[in-house]
Design a protein with these regions (language model features):
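Acetyl-CoA-dependent GNAT
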Residues: 43-51, 55-124, 135-137, 141, ...
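Conserved glycine-rich acetyl-CoA-binding loop
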Residues: 109, 118, 122-136, 143-145, ...
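Conserved Rossmann-like nucleotide-binding pocket used by diverse enzymes
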Residues: 37, 115-117, 150
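C-terminal "cap" of GNAT-fold acetyltransferases
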Residues: 148, 155-162, 167-168, 174-195
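Conserved N-terminal entry element of GNAT/NAT acetyltransferase domains
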Residues: 7-44, 51, 55, 193-195
Length: 195
């Protein structure tokens, strides 16, 4: 399944700390006809999933529980097995994969019907609506896939992610909780209902 969304407010949030030349290059790359493409992957797309997931673990290891060392050791069958209980979305811009997440259908905390995880957007494309486009895809397919009420966990120190989730309709649910995978760290549940 492929769904395209026009890139709205594409110049908002352009790499706040980048040089004027880097900003200009990014603006030129994201010409007026740019669109974000959201793909629902199949097991045959395992290599595409592996590539973006390992990029995410290298770029932002602090955002995830699993490590690059753990996941880089998975073979093809290990990656394919992930599709047995989870759906994977990838957001692409100009044929470059720039964002990802997974959705697991379950009856979770706070009345959720599914759990979102592994959310990541390439830092060069944050603020361009990649994550928002993936959640719009979720909204369009929420009834048929059982994705009506989404839940997720976010590290409490990751205020940028918390603000991004709030901007697309998530709200805090419950109290912060201690992590079992990262002693001394805390995470917060957030929930959102599809529109």
């Amino acid at each position: 399944m492929i769904l395209k969304f026009d890139l709205i407010q594409k110049f908002r949030g352009i790499y706040k700390h980048s040089s004027p030349n880097a900003r200009l290059n990014l603006i030129m790359k994201l010409g007026s006809s740019s669109q974000i493409t959201v793909n629902l992957l199949t097991p045959d797309n395992w290599l595409r999933l592996k590539n973006i997931r390992l990029r995410a673990l290298i770029e932002n290891p602090e955002a995830f529980g699993p490590t690059y060392d753990e996941e880089s050791k998975l073979n093809e069958q290990g990656w394919r097995n992930r599709f047995k209980k989870e759906d994977y979305l990838i957001g692409s811009l100009e044929n470059e994969d720039v964002g990802t997440m997974y959705i697991e259908v379950l009856k979770g905390d706070h009345g959720t019907t599914c759990w979102i995880g592994g959310c990541w957007t390439d830092p060069r494309y944050r603020g361009f609506g990649v994550m928002k486009s993936m959640f719009e895809f979720i909204d369009l397919h929420s009834k048929e896939k059982g994705w009506q009420r989404q839940g997720l966990g976010v590290w409490v120190h990751n205020q940028g992610a918390i603000k991004a989730y709030e901007s697309i309709g998530f709200s805090v649910a419950g109290e912060k909780m201690a992590s079992t995978s990262r002693p001394g760290s805390y995470f917060q549940h957030m929930v959102r209902d599809s529109k």
